[in-house]
Amino acid sequence: MRGLHGQDLLRRPVRLRGIQLGRVVDLILDAAGTRVVGFDVLCGDGTHRFLPLSAAEAQPDQIAVRSALSLLDAAELTFYQERGTTLAALRLEELDDVVLGAGGEVRERVPRAGGDSPGS
C-alpha cells in the first residue's frame, strides 16, 4: 500500500481470483485516524461488509482477497466504524485525503484546498 492516496482506493473493485465481490466505498481507520484497519465494501448483493486490511492486497487495479470469507458481515463493519473513524468522516471535517504507507499507516494528511472547512 506504499504511497497510496486513500481516495484512489475508493471504488476500487474487490476481487477473488478475478471474480468481483464488491467495491471499496470507504476506508475504516483507527480511532486516532493514524492507521487504516480495513475497508467498507459494498458487495454485489447490496450488503456492506468489512474487509480487514490484513486480509487484503492492494494492487494497481483491484483489492485482492484470498477468500470470500475475508469479507465480514455488517456487525463487524459497525463495530469498527463505531470504534474508529472513516475517510468519509475525515473528509467532512478538515481533510481532502490521506496518503498511506506500506502497513496502512497514515503518512500524510492532505488538507482541503484553500483550508476551507465544510459550510465555509
Predicted regions and their residues:
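Peripheral interaction segments used for macromolecular assembly
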Residues: 1-120
